[in-house]
Swiss-Prot record:
It is found in: Mitochondrion inner membrane. PANTHER family: PEROXISOMAL MEMBRANE PROTEIN 2, PXMP2 MPV17 (PTHR11266), PROTEIN MPV17 (PTHR11266:SF17). GO terms for biological process: ethanol metabolic process. It comes from Candida glabrata (strain ATCC 2001 / BCRC 20586 / JCM 3761 / NBRC 0622 / NRRL Y-65 / CBS 138) (Yeast). Keywords: Membrane, Mitochondrion, Mitochondrion inner membrane, Transmembrane, Transmembrane helix. Pfam families: Mpv17_PMP22 (PF04117). Its main location: mitochondrion. GO terms for cellular component: mitochondrial inner membrane. InterPro entries: Mpv17_PMP22. This is Protein SYM1. Belongs to the peroxisomal membrane protein PXMP2/4 family.
Amino acid sequence: MIRLFQLYEHQLKVRPKLTNSIMTGALFGIGDVSAQLLFPSGPDTLPPSAQTNDVKRGKYDIPRTVRAVVYGSMIFSFIGDRWYRFLTKVKFSNKPAKHWSNMVLRVCVDQLGFAPLGLPFYFGCMSLLEGHGLGAAREKIKLQWWDTLKTNWCVWPLFQMVNFSLVPLQHRLLAANVVAIFWNTFLSYTNSQIPVGGHKLTVQYPPTVQ
């Protein structure tokens, strides 16, 4: 494990964008695999528009995992990297960069800025990757956005305080993605128990796809 992390550190210095892309995609894929294996979707847990033949038969949904990897590696890895670099510049002008007040400010900017906007962006991307239009994205946002955001605020602010305080900049996206594996699995389970519009919808952020 130590040697693997050392290899990751070396590649991060030599090829930072490619390394972040591969690692983020892999962790998103792992999150989707764990969610599907622990809490498989069936016809009673998804709306009719999301029911494929494989889902109806209770089979593992490979395209869903592929979409998770594609979104993580080709979209979110670059957005997340730029966002964390931007957050390091967010600070009060009269306070040292490492002052506790700046850490609180960064968490507030992250949770009140990125989180509310990241959800509709994610649902829009997933709808396109699934072959649906923006109408499906609007439906997902209407059903899932507020409850998902409230749950997000119960989990991520505390982690981000630790992330911004103790984790080096180059590892913050990795740390967030590792925690997101457990976050997606937990959120998938809790929200699959809540009936929405006559169906049970699995809600995940960010970002395990369905």
